[in-house]
Curated annotation (Swiss-Prot):
This is Ceramide hydroxylase. GO terms for biological process: lipid biosynthetic process; sphingolipid metabolic process. Disruption phenotype: Deletion of the gene leads to a ceramide molecule with a mass reduction of 16 Da corresponding to the loss of a hydroxyl group. Coiled coil: none annotated. The gene is cerH. Its main location: membrane. GO terms for molecular function: oxidoreductase activity, acting on paired donors, with oxidation of a pair of donors resulting in the reduction of molecular oxygen to two molecules of water.
Amino acid sequence: MAKTASDISLTRQAMSLTEDLMTPNAAIYWADLTISAAVMWGGFLIAATTSSLALGLGAALLSMLALYRGLSFIHELTHIRDDEAPGFRVGWNVLVGVPLMTPSLMYEGVHNIHHIKDRFGTRLDPEYLPLSRFTPLKLAGFLFIALLAPLGVILRSAILIPLSFLVPSLRRYLKTKLSALIINPDFVREDLGRWRKAWVIQDVACWLWSWAVIAGLGLGVVPVRVVLTGLAIFSLATFLNQARTLVAHHWDNDGDKMTLEEQFLDSVNVPPPNLASALWAPVGLRYHALHHLLPRLPYHNMAKAHARLVEALGADSLYHRASEPGLFEALGDLFRRVRQKNAEARNQPAH
């Protein structure tokens, strides 16, 4: 895949304008994660125990948004080194990853493939599907299936993980097909030899946590309401993330290799003045096109980097073509393109 002049120009310009913003600030990472986890667990506790419906719903909403934000740090873990935020990976797994049965290794070693230039948008990309070519019903199914994600991680942690330690073939299947946060169902993990010890530690931790909750529920120590509240909050967070996923790209590629320009223009920013995007696309995810341009840029510097690029790059720059005004506008555009492509397919003469 050859680079075009515009590919090189935009990348070089962006790197030149933001080279002083590439260092992660560990204090910001830790403070953000700690506050997010505190709000997540505190809101959950209130929602699961209060007798006030209004207070319970408000607390659940705050908990859901904080859970979503905390869980989104799994994306940052794939782009920062351990020495840039010492202990952060372990801290995240303790506060968020293991309790949600979504440990960091379900994304580490996977997301980086999405950034490999000759894999992006192809059938080898774990995070890409030609969604704009789906039928409207299939696209809606893709969105709403996310509500079942918590049940999936419970099944994986409570049943499949312990069984996999007894059945080697199941262990291999679990790691290759059921241990990655992906949207491409054909993706198969190939990094089985990496992080062997970490895999065991994270899987066993999720297994024991799930069994502890189930045992507490069976013994009456953990009320049913607590479990149902937790599942509802988790489900809504995964649904919101799936909605965000739908607007992270335009999803127009059908498996062919793309130039860097095509990859960038297939990606989407939802920048200010849209303030709501900080809630539904937290931890820098609202600058998704910028992230594909500069994958090493830490989330806390993305707003500043975006502002610099908007100011410095000319009106004819590709960079300005990557922005959408908001979530509903971008979703509406996707569903319009889906309907249009389906109509065009129906009108094509049969061969």
